[in-house]
Amino acid sequence: MDPLSAASKIAGSGLEVQSTRLRIVSENIANARSTGDTPGADPYRRKTVTFGSELDHVSGVERVKVKKLGVDRGDFVHEYDPGNPAADTNGMVKMPNVNVLIEMADMREANRSYDANLQVIRQTRDLVASTIDLLKASQ
């Protein structure tokens, strides 16, 4: 495989994993206040994504892939909300272990990574087009 095609393939895998990362972040943000339905029930637990590399045997390039989708085993936060159906006898409710500020920072990083991979694909496409134009002009 030529180097430009390899670069596009690698960047394409980067787009895929960053899309997954953005989906997970959006799920976490959307569920940041999702409690259990009954007293003592666990609320939404923050999801995580882990990346890994994988050799593409056809092209010979190392691509990035989603290695594992998991959950954050961190502690839940307890809030006083006696009117909540999930409140215990003391009025305390288990709240998700999602920190929206951390999720927003993760979202920005994923967006930047996605944009960088997209730029690699655009640059590669432009280089291929320039090469084709150069070859046409020399005939």
From Swiss-Prot:
<comment type="subunit">
    <text>The basal body constitutes a major portion of the flagellar organelle and consists of four rings (L,P,S, and M) mounted on a central rod. The rod consists of about 26 subunits of FlgG in the distal portion, and FlgB, FlgC and FlgF are thought to build up the proximal portion of the rod with about 6 subunits each.</text>
</comment>
<keyword id="KW-0975">Bacterial flagellum</keyword>
<dbReference type="InterPro" id="IPR010930">
    <property type="entry name" value="Flg_bb/hook_C_dom"/>
</dbReference>
<comment type="similarity">
    <text>Belongs to the flagella basal body rod proteins family.</text>
</comment>
<dbReference type="InterPro" id="IPR019776">
    <property type="entry name" value="Flagellar_basal_body_rod_CS"/>
</dbReference>
<dbReference type="GO" id="GO:0030694">
    <property type="term" value="C:bacterial-type flagellum basal body, rod"/>
</dbReference>
<dbReference type="InterPro" id="IPR006299">
    <property type="entry name" value="FlgC"/>
</dbReference>
<dbReference type="GO" id="GO:0009425">
    <property type="term" value="C:bacterial-type flagellum basal body"/>
</dbReference>
<dbReference type="GO" id="GO:0071978">
    <property type="term" value="P:bacterial-type flagellum-dependent swarming motility"/>
</dbReference>
<dbReference type="Pfam" id="PF06429">
    <property type="entry name" value="Flg_bbr_C"/>
</dbReference>
<protein>
    <recommendedName>
        <fullName>Flagellar basal-body rod protein FlgC</fullName>
    </recommendedName>
</protein>
